[in-house]
């Protein structure tokens, strides 16, 4: 009998930059992914990050902004400028 394929693939490592695109994530994963991203971005010393959630119906934007409002080291957040995603992305200012 052949061994079963591992149902848990190896984790994917993503380089942490000051911009993070959530388009490839399911809404059910957004909270955990954004929390992990913010922790790593803060650890790296980023003062500002851009989280791209898309325009859509606003489900991902709402989740992102809830996480931001609950995160102690987030000073403030707002829509990205028009040239950088507008209301399809959120800019967060972090304590450094």
Predicted regions and their residues:
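Long, charged, low-complexity intrinsically disordered regions
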Residues: 1-96
